[in-house]
Structure formats: structure tokens, C-alpha cells
């Protein structure tokens, strides 16, 4: 078959496919605008936004946040919710653990009056609610907290001590097969919070694993491993917060395995001012001499905590340092990308 005949045959095949499955069911990759720019939501920590390589967590994808207890998983997810709301988006929180603190969420910056929350009885209900919300095309981010708390209905109806092999893994695999395409069409970001477990009998290598089987690892575009590495001491005997280290364990949109560090303070969540200061020092924008921090010909202050407080008060200086950091790192800011969300009819999920 020569070139003109091949072209005619391809055009005929495309015409038949579009007639059979609808317009837009097949197209040139270059004409698909979604491949050229990724709409993202900021995480609240600039160091993590830079480590992700795209300026935040992507819309239309699945993101998994996992780590040990009290490592900041829910705090990070709530910051993403707050930033989505600040961009004019709608957020939903599926609280399978029944442990979300409205006061702390409000302190972080989430608008709890506009935040939709669901506390389902079983895992099937939780995942069905997530799919229905995504299918509506009106929700920008859905947080599922957590995978370990998604109890299959048959396990819930059974007795304590009954053995249920692979029930949760099968439930997650079935749900994610349906959810992935829906999220991509509606440009909804689904954030799954997950816990750490240990494999029994592992002598060599890392014994840690996450709950819910392998499906979530496969379908996630980004997997974020978050750990507490130290305490932030105050002037008195009590701690101000925790120092957190994050590793991007998987990334389909940028180079993986990058790391980032930031502070989580008990009275404000992720310290954006602390992130800016650390990055400014790292990129030689702010000079650190002993305990003093200098910017250009100006002394910012003595001691990291004092300078961090100064950056919180001085919005102009904060924005200037952030702009210079972004210019040096050449990573795009997380911006609002207008998406034409196609209205989809909501049907019950079987």
C-alpha cells in the first residue's frame, strides 16, 4: 500500500471510529491541549512544589501521600484543599477515619463552610462517593483519608477475628480502574492518604509497605513519602512543631526521587515563610553569616525563627524572595488553568 492509500485508509478508519464512539474519541496527540500544560494545585510548601517538578500536585491524576503516624499526611492534604479553595475551586474530604478536626483545618486556611465532607460506613461507599463527585465535573480535589480505614462491607458485616484475604486490595483495584478515567476527564485531583505497615520475615531490604495492595501504587501519578525527622524547639521547654522530610517516591510528570524539607508548626501548619527562607539561603539569595541573615544590603535579623517571623509580617519581602527563587529554579508557578469541564450525568455506581 502506497502513502496516499495509507492516508485514505487511516482517514476512513478515524471517521468510522468517531461515528461509532463519538467526536474526539481519537485525535492527534499534538492537538490535545491537555498534554501541553498541566494544571496544578500548590502544596503549601514551596520546597515540595519544586521537588514535584511541576509546581504542585496535578489535577486529573491520583496522588498518594503515605508515611508513619503523626508525620503530617493530613496536614499536607488539608493545605492542598485550602489552596484549591483559594484558586476558586471546590474541595471534598472523605473522612473514613472520622478524625478530621474542623478547627485545625480552619487554622490551616481551609474554608470549612464550603468544604464538603463525607464519613461513609464502608470502603465501597467511600469510593463510590469519590467517583460520583469526580464524574460531576464540579470538584477540583477529593481527599480520601485514609486507605487503611476503607473497610470492605463484607468485613464490616462479619465478626472480629474472621479472616478476609485480599478483600481490600480487590476493592481498591476495582474502584481505581473506574476512577482513573473519570478523574482525567473531569480534571479532578484525588489524594489518597495511606499508612505504613511492615512485612513479616523480611531480613534484607525495606520491610515497609503501604495498605490496600498494589493497585494504588500503579495508578498513582505521584507518590509522596513524608517523614518527621526532628522537633522544632521553642524558647521554653515545649516544641513549636516538627521538621519534615518528603521524598517523591514516584513521579510520572517529572524526575522522581527528589527530596524536600519544611516545617510544620502546631499553630499554623506548614510554614511557608520557613520554606522561603531555607530556599533563599540554599540558592544564595539570602546570605547567612553565623546566626545573622542578610538580604542585599539589609539585615533581616538574628536567628532563623526571628527571620521567619519577619517574613510572615513583611508580605512584600516574602513575595520578592519567592519570585527570585522561582526565577532561579525555573519551575512554573501553580496557576489556575481554565478547564472546560464537560457536564456528565451522574448515575448510581454499582
From Swiss-Prot:
Family annotation (InterPro entries): AAA+_ATPase, DNA_recomb/repair_RecA, DNA_recomb/repair_RecA_CS, P-loop_NTPase, RecA-like_C, RecA-like_N, RecA_ATP-bd, RecA_C_sf
Organism of origin: Chlamydia felis (strain Fe/C-56) (Chlamydophila felis)
Pfam families: RecA, RecA_C
Location of the protein in the cell: Cytoplasm
UniProt keyword annotation of DNA-binding present: yes
Annotated positions binding ATP: 67-74
Name recorded for this polypeptide: Protein RecA
Molecular function terms, GO-annotated: ATP binding; ATP hydrolysis activity; ATP-dependent DNA damage sensor activity; damaged DNA binding; single-stranded DNA binding
A Gene Ontology cellular-component term: cytosol
Amino acid at each position: 500500500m502506497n502513502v496516499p492509500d495509507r492516508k485514505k485508509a487511516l482517514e476512513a478508519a478515524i471517521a468510522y471510529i468517531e461515528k461509532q464512539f463519538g467526536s474526539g474519541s481519537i485525535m492527534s496527540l499534538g492537538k490535545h491541549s491537555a498534554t501541553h500544560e498541566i494544571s496544578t494545585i500548590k502544596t503549601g510548601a514551596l520546597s515540595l512544589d519544586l521537588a514535584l517538578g511541576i509546581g504542585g500536585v496535578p489535577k486529573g491524576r491520583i496522588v498518594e501521600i503515605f508515611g508513619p503516624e503523626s508525620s503530617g499526611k493530613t496536614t499536607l492534604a488539608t493545605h492542598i484543599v485550602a489552596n484549591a479553595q483559594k484558586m476558586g475551586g471546590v474541595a471534598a474530604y472523605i473522612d473514613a477515619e472520622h478524625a478530621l478536626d474542623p478547627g485545625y483545618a480552619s487554622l490551616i486556611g481551609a474554608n470549612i463552610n464550603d468544604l464538603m465532607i463525607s464519613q461513609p460506613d464502608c470502603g465501597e461507599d467511600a469510593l463510590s462517593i469519590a467517583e460520583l463527585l469526580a464524574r460531576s465535573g464540579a470538584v477540583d480535589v477529593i481527599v480520601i483519608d485514609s486507605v487503611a480505614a476503607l473497610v470492605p462491607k463484607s468485613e464490616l458485616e462479619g465478626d472480629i477475628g474472621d479472616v478476609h484475604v485480599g478483600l481490600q486490595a480487590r476493592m481498591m483495584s476495582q474502584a481505581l480502574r473506574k476512577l482513573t478515567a473519570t478523574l482525567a476527564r473531569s480534571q479532578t485531583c484525588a489524594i489518597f492518604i495511606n499508612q505504613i505497615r511492615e512485612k513479616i520475615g523480611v531480613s534484607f531490604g525495606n520491610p515497609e509497605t503501604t495498605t490496600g495492595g498494589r493497585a494504588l501504587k500503579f495508578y498513582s501519578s505521584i507518590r509522596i513519602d513524608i517523614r518527621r525527622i526532628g522537633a522544632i524547639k521553642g524558647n521554653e521547654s515545649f516544641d513549636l512543631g516538627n521538621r519534615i522530610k518528603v521524598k517523591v517516591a514516584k513521579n510520572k510528570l517529572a524526575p522522581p526521587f527528589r527530596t524536600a524539607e519544611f516545617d510544620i508548626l502546631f499553630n499554623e501548619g506548614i510554614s511557608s515563610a520557613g520554606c522561603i527562607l531555607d530556599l533563599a539561603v540554599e540558592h544564595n539569595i539570602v546570605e547567612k553569616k553565623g546566626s545573622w541573615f542578610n538580604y542585599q544590603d539589609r539585615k533581616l535579623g538574628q536567628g532563623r525563627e526571628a527571620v521567619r517571623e519577619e517574613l510572615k509580617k513583611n508580605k512584600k519581602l516574602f513575595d520578592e524572595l519567592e519570585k527570585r527563587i522561582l526565577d532561579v529554579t525555573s519551575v512554573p508557578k501553580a496557576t489556575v488553568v481554565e478547564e472546560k469541564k464537560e457536564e456528565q450525568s451522574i448515575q448510581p455506581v454499582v
